[in-house]
A protein has these predicted regions:
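Short aromatic/hydrophobic "clamp" motif used to bind/position activated sugar donors
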Residues: 88
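Glycine-rich, basic loop-to-helix element that forms the pyrophosphate-binding segment
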Residues: 67-83
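Conserved donor NDP-sugar-binding/catalytic core segment of glycosyltransferases
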Residues: 100-134
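A conserved acidic beta->alpha catalytic loop
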Residues: 40-51, 95
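Short, flexible, basic/aromatic active-site loop/helix in glycosyltransferases
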Residues: 122, 138-157
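Non-catalytic, C-terminal membrane-associated alpha-helical segments of glycosyltransferases
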Residues: 229-234, 245-311
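Acidic donor-binding loop at a coil-to-helix junction in glycosyltransferase catalytic cores
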Residues: 183-196
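Short, well-formed alpha-helical segments that are part of the catalytic scaffolds
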Residues: 15-29
Length: 311
């Protein structure tokens, strides 16, 4: 391994068809000519991606890592630790890469600004079936696409996990990815968390306007049911960031029971509303708050256990 390599890191778990599509588009976009190494980090104990990596060795430089523990952030930390001096472009296993993106990331790799910058580009969407118009406001940027508005500072909108890059040395310095977050864990929050830490260490986020990558969105990833599951996980994440140092009832702050009752009442009152958005909105608000309540109980329980063990 050279002192500084350019790595394209793809964490995957049991999605061979989508992974093949991603690698194929990397090859078509000229990843071999750009001098990058594709690293597939398969987590969850399976090795289904190993034959695919072997198959593409004649098309690009590609390496494979197998990890027993499940979790995207665990897989990405493994890549960071294995390629500690490298520049790492993080992609999801369900994206379509453009030639312009490959060229844009190669340029910033060659600039070698370790300890100064990290990078991200816009995200387009390859959608299997467009969602209902009213549902779009509840969908994450990974399902609707993202392009930094002109004049906005990049720190106001964190880069999406399907298309961003940083030097491994900078990620190691800030502690890497939080393995309690991300797909396989909470399902949300991993890239925002690590980018916050990079900014806290003094790095500047740089937007690569031409580095377009397209994210595949199947119909079940932009459905009301999927959005509600995500809202629950978002509630858990937000709950974990709040200090609940107040009187408790059954392991939870008392005011939460009052708020939960209010939200439950709103949901029940709209169960038969003719407006699907109104029905969904009250369900979303309730489910988000239930996730928040669950995390509050878990945190206080873990704090109590820690106190008991120390006695």
């Amino acid at each position: 391994m050279s002192s500084a390599e350019w790595i394209v890191a793809i964490a995957t778990c049991g999605r061979q068809t989508l992974l093949r599509r991603t690698v194929e588009h990397l090859v078509k976009a000229g990843i071999r000519e750009a001098g990058a190494t594709v690293v597939i980090a398969e987590n969850g104990g399976s090795t289904w991606a190993r034959p695919l990596a072997a198959e593409y060795k004649s098309h690009c430089k590609i390496e494979y890592i197998s990890l027993k523990k499940r979790g995207k952030t665990h897989a990405l930390n493994a890549v960071v630790n294995n390629y500690r001096t490298s520049f790492i472009w993080f992609l999801d296993d369900d994206v379509r890469v453009t030639k312009d993106a490959v060229l844009a990331y190669r340029r910033v790799f060659e600039a070698g600004l370790v300890g100064r910058e990290f990078y991200g580009g816009p995200l387009g969407i390859d959608c299997e079936q467009p969602p209902e118009h009213w549902l779009r406001q509840y969908l994450p940027r990974s399902a609707t696409g993202w392009n930094k508005c002109e004049g906005n500072n990049a720190t106001n909108a964190f880069f999406l996990g399907a298309n961003w890059a940083a030097w491994a040395a900078d990620l190691l310095k800030c502690g890497g990815f939080d393995e309690h977050l991300g797909p396989g864990r909470t399902g949300v929050g991993d890239e925002e968390d690590v980018q916050r830490k990079l900014i806290a260490t003094g790095l500047n986020p740089v937007y690569l306007e031409n580095a377009m990558v397209y994210h595949w969105v199947p119909r079940d990833r932009c459905s009301p049911r999927w959005v509600l599951r995500r809202a629950f996980n978002m509630g858990r994440l937000e709950g974990s960031r709040i200090d609940f140092s107040c009187p408790l009832l059954f392991g939870r702050p008392r005011w939460m029971f009052r708020e939960a009752a209010v939200r439950l009442g709103r949901w029940l009152a709209t169960r038969f509303d003719r407006d699907p958005e109104q029905r969904f909105r009250t369900a979303y608000e309730l489910v988000f708050f239930l996730g928040w309540m669950l995390e509050a109980k878990q945190r206080n329980r873990s704090q109590s256990n820690g106190t008991s063990e120390s006695k």
